[in-house]
């Protein structure tokens, strides 16, 4: 979360992919549903969904937004939280900021490049920023 980047690194330590992200609006480690924090730690990919038809209401008065998750939703196995994942967006201007309800958000084009590199049960590590550590 410090650099607002997602990186795919192979077992030799070679970086295969990097892209800018948006993460949880609030600093710190996810504690409960609705806290707007991105979980920190070591997780696994539990599923990869086609999310093109999914909708989400951001409670901003605009109602349900089709395509809010972009073309794919990479679901993470996060104990106590069933809706955390890595996904695309309908709002690429949010990237590089803390704007999500807890997920990791990418540009749809970057997500399309990431998908061939991801498989179940791949390991995902989410590291805190210095400010996240202060808030924990």
What are the functions of these language-model segments?
Residues 1-33, 40, 125-136:
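Intrinsically disordered, low-complexity
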Residues 43-45:
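Conserved hydrophobic positions within beta-strands
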Residues 32-35, 51-136:
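Exported/periplasmic cell-wall-interacting domains
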């Amino acid at each position: 979360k410090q650099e607002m980047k997602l990186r795919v690194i192979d077992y030799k330590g070679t970086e295969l992919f990097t892209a800018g992200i948006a993460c949880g609006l609030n600093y710190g480690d996810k504690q409960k549903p609705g806290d707007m924090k991105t979980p920190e730690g070591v997780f696994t990919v539990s599923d990869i969904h086609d999310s093109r038809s999914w909708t989400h209401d951001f409670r901003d008065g605009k109602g349900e937004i089709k395509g809010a998750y972009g073309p794919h939703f990479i679901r993470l196995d996060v104990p106590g939280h069933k809706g955390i994942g890595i996904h695309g967006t309908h709002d690429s201007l949010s990237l590089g900021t803390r704007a999500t309800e807890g997920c990791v958000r990418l540009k749809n084009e970057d997500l399309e490049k990431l998908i061939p590199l991801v498989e179940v049960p791949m390991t995902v590590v989410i590291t805190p920023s210095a400010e996240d550590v202060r808030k924990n």
